[in-house]
Amino acid sequence: MYNETPIKRRPSTRIYVGNVPIGDGAPIAVQSMTNTKTTDVEATVAQIRALEKVGADIVRVSVPTMDAAEAFKLIKQSVSVPLVADIHFDYRIALKVAEYGVDCLRINPGNIGNEERIRSVVECARDKNIPIRIGVNGGSLEKDLMDKYKEPTPEALLESAMRHVDILDRLNFDQFKVSVKASDVFLAVESYRLLAKQIRQPLHLGITEAGGARAGAVKSAVGLGMLLAEGIGDTLRISLAADPVEEIKVGFDILKSLRIRSRGINFIACPSCSRQEFDVISTVNELERRLEDVTTAMDVSIIGCVVNGPGEALVSHIGLTGGHRKSGYYDEGERQKERFDNDNLVDSLEAKIRAKASQMANRIQVKDTTE
């Protein structure tokens, strides 16, 4: 498949969230956030494990109270994925979760308090080698900035971010990343563009409060796609009013679409029409469901007829082209003698895809050990 990419990543410094490298050319990390009550340790741990299962690199957990901080201690002991503590209003909560091994602290400049409080958080983070995310949000800008700009603007978000970047600079603390999120695509995109020109720290991308599963995914894909295509962004979170697991899936789909980072199967499927020789939609849906556990990056084309089928199969790892009663099967662009019965496509394709994924994974492993 044609995969030449003109995308040149923005140069940035390197930090680590747990064992996950961020910035300086590291793979763009995909993260989500739990939506359980943090004090419900069992439910929160279960959700974090579900996120880890679908590929989450980092998980953020809201810690609104000291009781939640105590719960965070137990949660941290129960999972292996790096955790970010989301802190608002009370800086003392940040100090407490730092004692419990948090991997990153997210603080909101709009409500964390004065510079002295920030200094306390920074000194604690420095002592324990914990990075910080300065998380600016268009919905919670500082009052003086709202008075100055009257509404959230790219300049307002930038000023909020930079005043806190300056504080960290004065404190000689450089282990941080920054985000300037907004629910409006154009506001967020322009804010990130301005910020990218001002600093070299890693940038965490997101369209905040993007909406439900469908609309939020589209809005995030448009906004983040614009930034990623310009080389901006080192981590991302898709904010959906939906199961957090969907955020991880959409995040990887966006990166996969831009050929930035691939995980799992990239299904190339026609929308179907009266020429289809089998039910394309149900076939693809069932294969997606069955093959969610496959992490090997591969392209699979499933086309219902011979108009575009052979051409798509030519540039896929595995291809299927609809035919009368039996459909043609391709491996690495080569037409195979084997044909699949249209009434048993899903089982046949699942077996072939799993075998191919295993073969490709072994090939990568051998290559890595010989280099």
Swiss-Prot record:
Keywords recorded for this protein, A-Z: 4Fe-4S, Iron, Iron-sulfur, Isoprene biosynthesis, Metal-binding, Oxidoreductase
GO terms classed as biological process: isopentenyl diphosphate biosynthetic process, methylerythritol 4-phosphate pathway; terpenoid biosynthetic process
Domain of life: Bacteria
EC number(s) per entry: 1.17.7.3
Pfam short name (any one): GcpE
Family membership noted in the UniProt record: Belongs to the IspG family.
Lineage: Bacteria, Pseudomonadati, Pseudomonadota, Gammaproteobacteria, Alteromonadales
Residues noted as binding [4Fe-4S] cluster in the record, renumbered to the chain: C270, C273, C305, E312
Cofactor note (record): Binds 1 [4Fe-4S] cluster.
Matching NCBIfam families: ispG_gcpE, PRK00366.1
Reaction(s) this enzyme catalyzes, per UniProt: (2E)-4-hydroxy-3-methylbut-2-enyl diphosphate + oxidized [flavodoxin] + H2O + 2 H(+) = 2-C-methyl-D-erythritol 2,4-cyclic diphosphate + reduced [flavodoxin]
Keyword Disulfide bond attached: no
Associated pathway: Isoprenoid biosynthesis; isopentenyl diphosphate biosynthesis via DXP pathway; isopentenyl diphosphate from 1-deoxy-D-xylulose 5-phosphate: step 5/6
Segment forming the signal sequence: none
Name by which UniProt lists this protein: 4-hydroxy-3-methylbut-2-en-1-yl diphosphate synthase (flavodoxin)
Necessary cofactors: [4Fe-4S] cluster
Gene Ontology MF terms in the entry: 4 iron, 4 sulfur cluster binding; 4-hydroxy-3-methylbut-2-en-1-yl diphosphate synthase activity (ferredoxin); 4-hydroxy-3-methylbut-2-enyl-diphosphate synthase activity (flavodoxin); iron ion binding
Protein role: Converts 2C-methyl-D-erythritol 2,4-cyclodiphosphate (ME-2,4cPP) into 1-hydroxy-2-methyl-2-(E)-butenyl 4-diphosphate.
